[in-house]
Amino acid sequence: MAPGSVLSLAVALATIIGISCTATVDETMRWKECLNTNQSIFDFQIETLQGEYTDLSQYRGKVILLVNVATFCAYTQQYTDFNPMLEKYQAQGLTLVAFPCNQFYLQEPAENHELMNGLTYVRPGNGWTPHQELHIYGKIDVNGDNHHPLYEFVKESCPQTVDKIGKTDELMYNPVRPSDITWNFEKFLIDRNGQPRFRFHPTAWSHGDVVTPFIEQLLAEPAN
């Protein structure tokens, strides 16, 4: 398939058959407090959209909202909430780290070099660009045999938010585990020391109102 055709095909499919997430209702109580751990997210290396490797220690001292994302999902409109949230809290130390993933109904088919065009021109579209504190990295697996070590860590550290993960025919990975990420736009809130503190189901959002009190709590805490 020619370069760029993957994204073009995905745009066409989204237009024709209306690809969306399995649910769009907010469930404000779908969150859990994480367990204490001696490890931190600063121990993990990640890949940029340009194929270079870096680590998360560059965000030491910040409160981090960690999100797995996808372009062709109803929850992609949450991107339009991210920028105002970051604008409000960036001076206090909030940043957002996003990892595209194609494991949920193949809703992120683009290659790394195509991802930003998908966000700008398709969903959320209308020329959307990320806030300077919204950092989008290369595609990863968040579940299954090849899940990224970062996600293995945060899933082990934070209890599951729901009893049922989803339909197996919509999950593009194996094996399915009880701790798995449930869908696109699941979130982990990380404190200034790199410790996972709270886990939020994708539906626990309500334009950010569900997560905001927890963000403010962690912003008020000093780094060790």
Curated annotation (Swiss-Prot):
Pfam families tied to this protein: GSHPx
GO cellular component: extracellular space
Gene Ontology terms, MF aspect: glutathione peroxidase activity
InterPro entries: Glutathione_peroxidase, GPX_AS, GPX_CS, Thioredoxin-like_sf, Thioredoxin_domain
Gene name of the record: gpx-3
Keywords for the protein's UniProt record, in alphabetical order: Glycoprotein, Oxidoreductase, Peroxidase, Secreted, Signal
Active site as annotated: C73
Family: Belongs to the glutathione peroxidase family.
Top EC class of this enzyme: oxidoreductase
GO biological process, one term: response to oxidative stress
EC number(s) reported in the record: 1.11.1.9
Protein name per Swiss-Prot or TrEMBL: Glutathione peroxidase 3
Subcellular location: Secreted, Extracellular space
Catalytic activity as recorded in UniProt: 2 glutathione + H2O2 = glutathione disulfide + 2 H2O
PROSITE patterns tied to this protein: GLUTATHIONE_PEROXID_1, GLUTATHIONE_PEROXID_2, GLUTATHIONE_PEROXID_3
Native organism: Caenorhabditis elegans
Residues the record marks as carrying a glycan: N38
PANTHER family per record: GLUTATHIONE PEROXIDASE (PTHR11592), GLUTATHIONE PEROXIDASE-RELATED (PTHR11592:SF88)
Stretch forming the signal peptide: 1-18
